[in-house]
Amino acid sequence: NQWAGYANSLHLYTELLPYVDRTWIGEGFTENNSLDFWLVEMSGIPFGLLSETLDARNQYRGLVFGMLPRLPWSGNPVPLWNLWDQFGMKDAKMFGYWDKNSPVKSDNASLPATVYVNGKKAMIVIANWTDMPQQAKITIDETALGFKPTKFSEPEIRNLQWGRKISGLNHCEIMGRGGMVVFFL
């Protein structure tokens, strides 16, 4: 671009980042970018910050990186914000799919899984980075997680997913560009 050349425009402000608690660097980027692009260019994670998305398009992909949508011109992220509050996200620890110490692993690289752990409960977010339906087995390391999950459910998130109980994560099928949020206790 004309301001930062081949670098992300955020690099122009690197010296200010220690004084920032969230970034908003996804404007002008499409939600159809690659998984690596989301991590490096849009998420804020390389700078030790969380980012936000401009709108409510493909919220699952944003959630894989801890990104919530701002209150956009269209869409309604409030049910998702309420879910984070209900879960106690402010006290949770995030383990991204890239973290070697993550207690949750997906066997399909097109379906990365990020887990948020808060005491004896956890929330997994899985997003499909392809246009086609994908399947994955999600493996949970109970020792690393710190508890043995006994109940699994997909919470209802208005305009995002229907609520339902599920038996586990041995077989997850997710539509193209879709995703799922799962609670377990």
Where is each model-derived feature located?
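C-terminal beta-strand-rich structural cap/linker in extracellular carbohydrate-active enzymes
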Residues: 163-185
